[in-house]
Amino acid sequence: WKQMSVW
């Protein structure tokens, strides 16, 4: 993942 890690 890339920005999904922020979720």
Curated annotation (Swiss-Prot):
Which key words tag this protein in UniProt? Amidation, Neuropeptide
Protein name per UniProt: WWamide-2
Q: Name one GO biological process term.
A: neuropeptide signaling pathway
Q: Which residues carry this modification: Tryptophan amide?
A: 7
